[in-house]
């Protein structure tokens, strides 16, 4: 999925340089959504690593 975020970011940069407003806006929008998703996942994994995965299992019981 990170691969798609990079692809859409590159497409939006190229389309923006060439002046294709609609294509650039669409690709940039998708890239922003994927970036936000990965940012949230990174924060979740950092918290899990700080607490230890065992803490999550104990809380679910």
UniProtKB/Swiss-Prot annotation:
Q: Where in the cell is it found?
A: Cell membrane
How does the protein's chain sit in the membrane according to the entry? Multi-pass membrane protein
Supply the alphabetized keyword list. Cell membrane, Membrane, Transmembrane, Transmembrane helix
Keyword Ribonucleoprotein: yes or no? Answer: no
Membrane-spanning residues: 5-25, 33-53
Sequence similarity: Belongs to the UPF0391 family.
HAMAP family from the UniProt entry: UPF0391
Descriptive protein name: UPF0391 membrane protein Bpro_0066
Organism from which the protein derives: Polaromonas sp. (strain JS666 / ATCC BAA-500)
């Amino acid at each position: 999925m990170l691969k798609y975020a990079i692809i859409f970011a590159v497409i939006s940069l190229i389309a923006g340089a060439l002046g294709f407003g609609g294509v650039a806006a669409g690709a940039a929008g998708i890239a922003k959504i994927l970036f936000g998703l990965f940012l949230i996942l990174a924060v979740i994994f950092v918290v899990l690593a700080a607490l230890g995965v065992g803490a999550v299992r104990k809380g679910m019981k």
